[in-house]
Regions:
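Walker B catalytic acidic pair
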Residues: 138-142
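Conserved adenine-nucleotide phosphate-binding loops and their immediately adjacent elements
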Residues: 2-36, 103-106
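Phosphate-binding P-loop
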Residues: 37-46
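Alpha-helical scaffold elements adjacent to nucleotide-binding pockets in ATP/GTP-utilizing enzyme cores
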Residues: 59-63, 88-96, 150-154
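Conserved NTP-binding/hydrolysis module of P-loop NTPases
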Residues: 84-107, 119-123
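P-loop NTPase Walker A phosphate-binding motif
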Residues: 46-76
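Mid-core helix/loop region of P-loop NTP-binding domains shared across ATPases and GTPases
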Residues: 103-137, 147-165
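A short hydrophobic beta-strand->loop->alpha-helix junction that borders the nucleotide-binding pocket
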Residues: 73-84, 111
Length: 168
């Protein structure tokens, strides 16, 4: 009996509760994406400037979708103060890490979230796969200064992942 085994590749972007909808009609950004890829060979973090309404969020979402198996994202639209809360951001990252490293565990909502076990597993997985794990963060320039230290501590954990690349 010759049965084919179908391997289902996870679209991690589907599990980002803040992932924006992408318009059906798009401007080609291939040259930008090629430039990002080229820059990621040298730099770990890229920060993209852009005025409101120029399509930066759409470009970031498109780039994330291009790497949907190796991408964790968080988009802040600026309208929801709750979306800027470090605990909410950390929870979203936790869920996406769980889908990425296929290690699901029930999380007690009263307990503090610990990303460390996921980060250890992700580091191992990336080392053996030679792929980058992309982190796409949009709208972080809108975060109030009172929350920046808490969010900085989350990002510092992520920066420890060797094959991680960050796009803000």
């Amino acid at each position: 009996m010759n049965k084919k085994t179908e391997i289902k590749i996870e679209d991690v972007c589907r599990h980002s509760v803040t992932f924006p909808s992408i318009p059906t009609t798009l401007i080609s950004r291939k040259s930008y994406f090629d430039l990002f890829e080229e820059q990621f060979e040298t730099y770990k973090v890229l920060c993209l400037p852009g005025a409101e309404g120029v399509g930066l969020t759409t470009a970031l979402a498109e780039f994330a979708k291009m790497h949907n198996q190796y991408c964790i994202s968080y988009f802040i639209d600026g309208f929801s103060r709750l979306a800027m809360e470090p605990r909410i951001i950390e929870h979203s990252l936790y869920v996406q890490f769980a889908y990425f490293d296929k290690h699901f565990s029930l999380m007690n909502e009263d307990k503090e979230i610990d990303l460390s076990p996921h980060i250890v597993r992700v580091k191992r997985r990336l080392k053996s796969s030679k792929n980058y794990l992309y982190f796409i963060f949009d709208g972080f320039d809108k975060i109030p200064s009172t929350l920046k230290d808490s969010i900085r501590s989350i990002l510092t954990l992520l920066l420890d992942i060797d094959n991680a690349r960050f796009l803000f």
